[in-house]
């Protein structure tokens, strides 16, 4: 089935996860008195600025399905703030079990799946990818990233697993590349995520490659945008890791995620393909154009009910707030959840740290002055990433806090909700600190 793509926008500004820098020394918040008595309840009274922001977006009908979740430490349930409806067109409130297209919030999951295999010795962090996928040996690099595909030079070194985890391999992306390389990505079906069954004016209809193995082979035939380990450039590298995981583990990518992450984390509502039996939980994804909203991927006819040709580790998952909070809780527990290890403490510590090669130039990139771990931004204290439909998730190891913004709209820059969410969190946490100090 053709995949209708829209340009998935820049996921954040430099300030995406800046709360760790502004809230230094706030680890004592973990002992604030919201405890067990508030589990599974709305905690808007503790987050009034966040709640006001959420209520404004919902009441103005800018968004339907806005929900914010917070969890402290290893609390076994996320607290919620806000909550609209599954759709702008009909009633039915969202909750922690509602289903959202998480797009690039898939990347930290694939990153941690890779870290599991590194921890087990089946992959090496600085191992050349060509040792796993020989087609990636002897890569070529475009002289001009937007120039002719024939105008190339040899790569100065091999692509490594570290580079794939951190978008420093020099690979392109259908939503980032320009000129002939972007056209080649479209022609070869090198898509990283699905948007809608409906045609979208102004955007190409792309037929995906017939499977993850074919997708990887086709990618290897195209030149890189940049020399490996020289520049941070948002790319399809996390999607390629799905194929690396298959070969290294001997399992299909989706099966590996289920066995090694979803099942042990207790994530029962995270899929590449939403079962029809769960259709009643799926939110609408809306488009925003000129201040007007329209159904982009309505839940009743969602493309996510179809089995994807290519399981996209960089942008293909649907999940629930409850499920993703359990993933964040596992990270915050350094690999442990409900008394059991999903992955080792070392694998989490390494995967959430700054893994950028020392030779990479971040000038002018989204990450300038910050770091990147296994599929997500790393600031030292925080780790996380966002999704193309407005979602945002992070763990803060200093605060012992897990937080997530849930909504569904495209393009994500249509509203400044991410920046507003972070600013609102900062304001409420400042009040919490003051109250604790006064007490």
Per-region residue spans from a language model:
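Glycine-rich phosphate/pyrophosphate-binding beta-alpha loops
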Residues: 310-316, 382-394, 408-412
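N-terminal secretory signal peptides
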Residues: 1-15
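Active-site SXXK
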Residues: 54, 74, 101-129, 238-246, ...
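N-terminal export leaders
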Residues: 12-32
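Short, gly/Ser/Thr-rich active-site loops of penicillin-recognizing serine hydrolases
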Residues: 333, 337, 352-362, 412-439
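Short, conserved catalytic-motif segment at the N-terminal edge
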Residues: 43-102, 122-124, 138-150, 380, ...
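Short, surface-exposed loop or secondary-structure junction motifs
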Residues: 78, 140-379
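Short, well-ordered beta-strand elements
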Residues: 79-81, 393-395, 400-410
